[in-house]
């Protein structure tokens, strides 16, 4: 079974992991409502995609008290 010949130092390990960071998401404004959304996806606020409204946005109903 293979075993490392030398122990990796902290700086070597951390240098290798320097490229593992998560990048920030690429956001684009919705052409209909100007809210930022992910590209190539339906707008979560208005339901607009490319040429028209694909989904009707969900409207939250207020809770009724008993």
UniProtKB/Swiss-Prot annotation:
Domain of life of the organism encoding this protein: Bacteria
Keyword Ribosomal protein: yes
InterPro entries the UniProt entry points to: Ribosomal_bL32 (IPR002677), Ribosomal_bL32_bact (IPR044957), Ribosomal_zn-bd (IPR011332)
SUPFAM superfamilies on file: Zn-binding ribosomal proteins
Chain spans, region Disordered: 1-20
GO molecular function ontology, one term from the record: structural constituent of ribosome
Homology family: Belongs to the bacterial ribosomal protein bL32 family.
Full protein name: Large ribosomal subunit protein bL32
Species lineage: Bacteria, Pseudomonadati, Spirochaetota, Spirochaetia, Leptospirales
Gene that this polypeptide is encoded by: rpmF
